[in-house]
């Protein structure tokens, strides 16, 4: 008979915590990570994953504290450096985030996630050429990174390099037929290249699966307008506005494909 239960083993606590992380239960995991570090303050695995859990809960400053503790123990922990940068970006410290992404790359020039994250941040800062350079580097290191390939297509589109963007999304969709975002953006790039009939075929297929998707409905309105299917374009634009008036109105006012609707009172009523 056992009268006094001993402390739970650190390894067992850590195993349980990581199980919660896999189940996307960061709150439960955090309680266990705290127990681990109470027993073993220098346990970098617990400290690092505690930081990841806090990031998931959007407690970014607390996450930074965890990553700093890891880096105090191991200044060359590239994952901690990279995730510290993510936390900094989330709190709006873009300068600090870029500094730490660069630090991660300097620590390990083959660490693809830092190039990818730095590319995404450059894109958000509207520095699209720098974004593309970083995404290209991420793909050079990890050619199978679907996230980097997809984001590369997005940036190419923003740079008006639509043939390259289309090729990018086609390749992703060919390898990953369930990647609906790539399929959607394939349609968008076809529209940008004036291939509206083919774009509409894609949008129709998507609406069979996601009939209420406002982005697809709006994209279909654009292509119908470009093909002078005015009544259909007006109808679809109205349907999109019912779902998200503020956003769709903003897009419609700036939309080049709606130039031929500017004299239509129905269009003006929608965007008024």
Which residues make up each language-model segment?
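Conserved alpha-helical positions within TPR/SEL1-like repeat arrays
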Residues: 14-22, 34, 45-56, 79-90, ...
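Terminal, low-structured helical/coil segments at or just beyond the last alpha-helical repeat
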Residues: 1-12, 16, 246-272
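Canonical positions in the second alpha-helix
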Residues: 36, 69-70, 103-104, 137-138, ...
